[in-house]
Amino acid sequence: MTLIYPATADAFRCIADACRHTCCKGWEIDIDPDTRAKYVAMTGEIGQRLRDAIADTPDGASFRLREDERCPMLNDSGLCDIITACGEGALCQICADHPRYRNEFSTFTEVGFGLCCEAAADLTLHWPQPMTWHTQGGGTRPQGSPEEEALLQARAALIRIMQDRTRGIPTRLNALCEAAGTVMPTRTAAEWADFLRTLERLEPAWDTVLARLTNAPDDLPDFSPLAVEQFTVYLLHRHVPGALLDDDLTGRVLFCAVSGMLFLRLSTLLGENEAARMYSSEIEYSEENLCSFLDELDAAGDE
């Protein structure tokens, strides 16, 4: 299968123990069947620790998190004992992939880097050139199905709108909505905060952020044009392909535009990197929250 990567791919590096928000804490870490079998067969102290750490359920295996929600294989220095003892090749699939996400098409797969990872957020938001994507090993991308190609052409046009640096960010976000046949909802910062409070919370600190958003001015700040561009382009790249499954291209584009606007507001409160990391963690990495957001935007369109 041909893989398509963003221009940032070669520059991405996990910052390991320097990470302030480790991906080895607070998440359910599933263990794929092949890796589980490998862990069960391992000898020595690391093998015993792995067997003790595996929780088997009817839905599959996962790591049994500690009381502080840290993975039992994450040591006090913030490093993974599996990597230290056995190398990166011993990681389960989800750990080897993270923070990568995949968009699966009929003849190729797109791979990107989720912004819940602070290293990926820092790299993506401050990438100076308009984001591009490249086929692994060079060459051209294989042709997809007619439906896929139509959607990819639409997405490319939307990304061009967002990358038009002759226009301001609010103009670009509104142009995205117009291209999708909709308009940006006219809600205050406090109203958006009220909606976000109805969603599942993954970090307690999110409540504090939403309280600050409630009191934020309603005028959009003139702030972080590069970061907002890259953030919104990332969302378009990642979420527009979902329309192949739910046939909701308009809703998904509106989600990207609204999220770009909210990121702009949150960046003034938290800074660019933390705003992206928290928003991605709270919204993108909860399927329930993402679906609720799309439903809310669908309802807003009927108002």
Regions found by a protein language model. Give the residues of each.
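Immediate flanking context of iron-sulfur cluster ligation sites
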Residues: M1-C19, R51-C92, T109
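Short, compositionally biased low-complexity segments
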Residues: A11-A18, Q129-W133, F231-R238
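General secretory precursor processing signal
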Residues: D17, T22, G26-W27, L74, ...
